[in-house]
């Protein structure tokens, strides 16, 4: 079964909820990543000098990650696969030595952040929709890395 219009709508509406409190949700996202993988701090230039609460670039990067996942959902609905609009994403991930386990950490942090953003609207269907969209994005990035 392919990605459905309902899944796309779930990702879209919850992405808007995420953006409504971008500062707090961005800090939460990177805090969750660093709790699971403290060494990942060195992969993000904007986290090297300080933690997630003191980084001016943190919001922009979090919005990009969530926006790319939102775009991945739309692509999965439209054509059943994800292609990267920014071809440099693969090279950047290679340069930062990103490996498979890092994608799993980011996915978990992404799902927990969406859950916090939507509150009682969280559901298994919403989790699945974001998970499938993120997996599509991750697969496209991994393909660009090789």
UniProtKB/Swiss-Prot annotation:
<feature type="binding site">
    <location>
        <position position="45"/>
    </location>
    <ligand>
        <name>heme b</name>
    </ligand>
</feature>
<keyword id="KW-0944">Nitration</keyword>
<dbReference type="GO" id="GO:0009609">
    <property type="term" value="P:response to symbiotic bacterium"/>
</dbReference>
<keyword id="KW-0408">Iron</keyword>
<feature type="modified residue" description="Phosphoserine">
    <location>
        <position position="45"/>
    </location>
</feature>
<comment type="subunit">
    <text>Monomer.</text>
</comment>
<keyword id="KW-0597">Phosphoprotein</keyword>
<comment type="function">
    <text>Leghemoglobin that reversibly binds oxygen O(2) through a pentacoordinated heme iron. In root nodules, facilitates the diffusion of oxygen to the bacteroids while preventing the bacterial nitrogenase from being inactivated by buffering dioxygen, nitric oxide and carbon monoxide, and promoting the formation of reactive oxygen species (ROS, e.g. H(2)O(2)). This role is essential for symbiotic nitrogen fixation (SNF).</text>
</comment>
<protein>
    <recommendedName>
        <fullName>Leghemoglobin 2</fullName>
    </recommendedName>
</protein>
<dbReference type="GO" id="GO:0005634">
    <property type="term" value="C:nucleus"/>
</dbReference>
<dbReference type="InterPro" id="IPR000971">
    <property type="entry name" value="Globin"/>
</dbReference>
<dbReference type="GO" id="GO:0005829">
    <property type="term" value="C:cytosol"/>
</dbReference>
<keyword id="KW-0813">Transport</keyword>
<feature type="modified residue" description="Nitrated tyrosine">
    <location>
        <position position="134"/>
    </location>
</feature>
<dbReference type="GO" id="GO:0046872">
    <property type="term" value="F:metal ion binding"/>
</dbReference>
<feature type="binding site">
    <location>
        <position position="61"/>
    </location>
    <ligand>
        <name>O2</name>
    </ligand>
</feature>
<feature type="binding site">
    <location>
        <position position="96"/>
    </location>
    <ligand>
        <name>heme b</name>
    </ligand>
</feature>
<comment type="similarity">
    <text>Belongs to the plant globin family.</text>
</comment>
<feature type="binding site" description="proximal binding residue">
    <location>
        <position position="93"/>
    </location>
    <ligand>
        <name>heme b</name>
    </ligand>
</feature>
<dbReference type="GO" id="GO:0009877">
    <property type="term" value="P:nodulation"/>
</dbReference>
<dbReference type="InterPro" id="IPR019824">
    <property type="entry name" value="Leghaemoglobin_Fe_BS"/>
</dbReference>
<dbReference type="Pfam" id="PF00042">
    <property type="entry name" value="Globin"/>
</dbReference>
<dbReference type="GO" id="GO:0032364">
    <property type="term" value="P:intracellular oxygen homeostasis"/>
</dbReference>
<feature type="binding site">
    <location>
        <position position="64"/>
    </location>
    <ligand>
        <name>heme b</name>
    </ligand>
</feature>
<keyword id="KW-0536">Nodulation</keyword>
<dbReference type="GO" id="GO:0043663">
    <property type="term" value="C:host bacteroid-containing symbiosome"/>
</dbReference>
<keyword id="KW-0535">Nitrogen fixation</keyword>
<dbReference type="GO" id="GO:0020037">
    <property type="term" value="F:heme binding"/>
</dbReference>
<keyword id="KW-0349">Heme</keyword>
<keyword id="KW-0539">Nucleus</keyword>
<keyword id="KW-0561">Oxygen transport</keyword>
<dbReference type="InterPro" id="IPR001032">
    <property type="entry name" value="Leghaemoglobin-like"/>
</dbReference>
<dbReference type="GO" id="GO:0019825">
    <property type="term" value="F:oxygen binding"/>
</dbReference>
<dbReference type="GO" id="GO:0005344">
    <property type="term" value="F:oxygen carrier activity"/>
</dbReference>
<keyword id="KW-0479">Metal-binding</keyword>
<keyword id="KW-0963">Cytoplasm</keyword>
<dbReference type="InterPro" id="IPR012292">
    <property type="entry name" value="Globin/Proto"/>
</dbReference>
<feature type="modified residue" description="Nitrated tyrosine">
    <location>
        <position position="30"/>
    </location>
</feature>
<dbReference type="InterPro" id="IPR009050">
    <property type="entry name" value="Globin-like_sf"/>
</dbReference>
<feature type="domain" description="Globin">
    <location>
        <begin position="2"/>
        <end position="146"/>
    </location>
</feature>
């Amino acid at each position: 079964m392919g990605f459905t219009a309902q899944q796309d709508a779930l990702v879209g509406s919850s992405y808007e909820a995420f953006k409504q409190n971008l500062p707090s949700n961005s800090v939460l996202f990177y805090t969750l990543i660093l709790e699971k993988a403290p060494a990942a701090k060195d992969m993000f230039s904007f986290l090297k000098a300080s933690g997630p609460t003191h980084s001016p670039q943190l919001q922009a990067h979090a919005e990009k990650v969530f926006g790319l996942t939102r775009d991945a959902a739309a692509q999965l609905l439209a054509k059943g696969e994800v292609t990267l609009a920014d071809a440099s994403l693969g090279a950047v991930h290679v340069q930062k030595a990103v490996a498979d386990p890092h994608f799993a950490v980011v996915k978990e942090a992404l799902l927990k952040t969406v859950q916090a953003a939507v509150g009682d609207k969280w559901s298994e269907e919403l989790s699945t929709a974001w998970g499938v969209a993120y997996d599509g994005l991750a697969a496209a990035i991994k393909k660009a890395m090789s």
